């Protein structure tokens, strides 16, 4: 065990609570000591929602430790059932309360006798899985539970819809731009003539889960959450799924072609090629922008990408393939799925880093000195410290990445947002040169008393001649660095030797 200053993926119970609180009219009871109950505060702070977070903590305190938890946990479940009248109550321990080794399944069976709603124990190993893995498992568990229940009651809808339809799986609370991505994918499906059968788990009710088999196929845009559910549905109902993330022009087209293939295989003849061409050439600005002179200014610039598997892999491909940016390092904190990530990004970057240690990523960024970083909130902090611009492309994120405006990352509108993010993350060439020549209004350290190009130091004629050989757009920088070097050493005149020594000291 080690003390973590920063965790990219939280503990398992956070994943379970994210799934439970994404559903409509589902309540979660967290069997935990005080200190593990920060989910409510985190969600109500970050998500722009009016409703309270449907999570209650059944506190493990001294009394519980001396008498056992059953009475308290069962009372809390029955009380919440009476107060909130949910369709389902999910009970989850945390890694701390798991140490008690209590028979929570027995508590659930006991509570089910008195509660009117369904009660389910989240079946997750809290020491083996992190937030994302636990979320994936909990979603599959809830879907499986209600499909079995519907089958038992004889109301499972297995007949396919008349028109092609899709289940969108993996949209959760606290996900990275999930609400915007969901809206964009609904628009995309409408343009393609595909009805949305169900969105899981965001805003779905558990009663609707019996309708899942009606859809012609499932779309899982995020690799972290939803894939286990899609695989289960494929085994159970031979329901195909598409797991290509439609992020960037190339991958969006590939995702649409895969959906076309799935529909054609089921006897529905569609051809989306004209739609792809129309969107790529005329609707999405990204393809046009990537050929413009503005984007060509970015060609060959160095970048570092780090995030979850879905966003880091997609972003690496977009930067390298669509914008000509040199991705020196691509990394992920999803160590459990490292092989997939390596296979996806190896040909698009120089180096692959798979780590949960924020220090290792910070050290790699400092060593590489990229022109821009694309990462999580943590990489944003690292960028601020090193004075390197950073675009946030993956969770974990802070409040500014839960925007009120419409900012999807998926689909064709997502390509525009990404192009803006990439372009605005790099310091523009002319801006850079003008700041160097004339000095900026936000210089962090004052090199001379003013920001004019007048100097209080004497320049020897040989040094002045050498300075004049330096290209104009960096001459001011060289002059300031040399004068700073001379001033620090108490020199009144700058000779050729001083100039060379300054150059060596700066490492130019």
UniProtKB/Swiss-Prot annotation:
EC number per UniProt: 1.3.7.7
Positions contributing to substrate binding: 429-430
Keyword set includes Transmembrane helix: no
InterPro entries: ChlB/BchB/BchZ (IPR050152), LI-POR_suB-like_C (IPR013580), Nase/OxRdtase_comp1 (IPR000510), P-CP_red_C (IPR042298), Protochl_reductB (IPR005969), Protochlorophyllide_Rdtase (IPR016209)
Gene Ontology terms: biological process: light-independent chlorophyll biosynthetic process; photosynthesis, dark reaction
This protein's pathway: Porphyrin-containing compound metabolism; chlorophyll biosynthesis (light-independent)
Binding residues annotated for [4Fe-4S] cluster, in chain numbering: 36
A GO molecular-function descriptor: ATP binding
Pfam families reported in the protein's UniProt record: Oxidored_nitro, PCP_red
Domain of life: Bacteria
Record's cofactor remark: Binds 1 [4Fe-4S] cluster per heterodimer. The cluster is bound at the heterodimer interface by residues from both subunits.
The protein's role, per its UniProt record: Component of the dark-operative protochlorophyllide reductase (DPOR) that uses Mg-ATP and reduced ferredoxin to reduce ring D of protochlorophyllide (Pchlide) to form chlorophyllide a (Chlide). This reaction is light-independent. The NB-protein (ChlN-ChlB) is the catalytic component of the complex.
Protein name (record): Light-independent protochlorophyllide reductase subunit B
Species: Synechocystis sp. (strain ATCC 27184 / PCC 6803 / Kazusa)
Organism lineage: Bacteria, Bacillati, Cyanobacteriota, Cyanophyceae, Synechococcales
Gene: chlB
């Amino acid at each position: 065990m080690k003390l973590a200053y920063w965790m990219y993926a939280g503990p398992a119970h956070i994943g379970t609570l994210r799934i439970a609180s994404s559903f409509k009219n589902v309540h979660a009871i967290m069997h935990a000591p005080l200190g593990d109950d920060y989910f409510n505060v985190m969600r109500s702070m970050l998500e722009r929602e009016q409703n309270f977070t449907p999570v209650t903590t059944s506190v493990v305190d001294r009394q519980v430790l001396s008498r056992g938890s059953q009475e308290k946990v069962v009372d809390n479940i029955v009380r919440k059932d009476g107060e909130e009248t949910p369709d389902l109550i999910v009970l989850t321990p945390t890694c701390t309360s798991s140490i008690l080794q209590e028979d929570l399944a027995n508590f659930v069976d006991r509570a089910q006798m008195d509660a009117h709603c369904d009660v389910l124990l989240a079946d997750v190993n809290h020491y083996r899985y992190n937030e994302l893995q636990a979320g994936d498992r909990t979603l599959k568990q809830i879907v499986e539970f209600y499909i079995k229940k519907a089958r038992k009651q004889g109301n499972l809808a297995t007949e396919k819809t008349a028109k092609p339809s899709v289940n969108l799986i993996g949209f959760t609370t606290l996900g990275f731009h999930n609400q915007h991505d969901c809206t964009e994918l609904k628009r995309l499906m409408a343009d393609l003539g595909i009805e949305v059968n169900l969105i899981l788990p965001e805003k779905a009710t558990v009663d609707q889960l019996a309708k899942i088999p009606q859809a012609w196929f499932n779309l899982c845009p995020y690799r972290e959450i939803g894939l286990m559910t899609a695989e289960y549905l494929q085994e159970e109902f031979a329901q195909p799924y598409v797991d290509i993330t439609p992020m960037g022009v190339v991958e969006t087209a590939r995702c649409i072609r895969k959906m076309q293939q799935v529909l054609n295989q089921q006897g529905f003849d569609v051809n989306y090629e004209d739609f792809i061409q129309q969107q790529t050439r005329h609707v999405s600005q990204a393809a046009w922008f990537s050929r413009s002179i503005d984007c060509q200014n970015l060609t060959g610039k160095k970048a570092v990408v780090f995030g979850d598997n879905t966003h880091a892999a997609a972003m690496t491909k977009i930067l390298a393939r669509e914008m000509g940016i040199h991705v020196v390092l691509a990394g992920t904190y999803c160590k459990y799925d490292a092989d997939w990530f390596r296979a996806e990004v190896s040909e698009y970057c120089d180096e692959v880093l798979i780590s949960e240690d924020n220090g290792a990523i910070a050290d790699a960024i400092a060593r590489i000195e990229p022109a821009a970083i694309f990462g999580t909130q943590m990489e944003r902090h690292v960028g601020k410290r090193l004075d390197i611009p950073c675009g946030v492309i993956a969770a974990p994120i802070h409040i500014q990445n839960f925007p009120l405006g419409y900012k999807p990352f998926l689909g064709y509108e997502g390509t525009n947002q990404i192009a803006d993010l990439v372009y605005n993350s790099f310091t523009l060439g002319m801006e850079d040169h003008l700041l160097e020549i004339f000095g900026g209004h936000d210089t962090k350290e004052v090199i001379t008393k003013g920001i004019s190009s007048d100097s209080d130091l004497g320049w020897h004629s040989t040094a002045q001649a050498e300075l004049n050989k330096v290209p104009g757009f960096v001459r001011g920088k060289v002059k300031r660095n040399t004068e700073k070097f001379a001033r620090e050493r108490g020199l009144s005149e700058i000779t050729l030797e001083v100039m060379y020594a300054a150059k060596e000291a700066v490492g130019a």
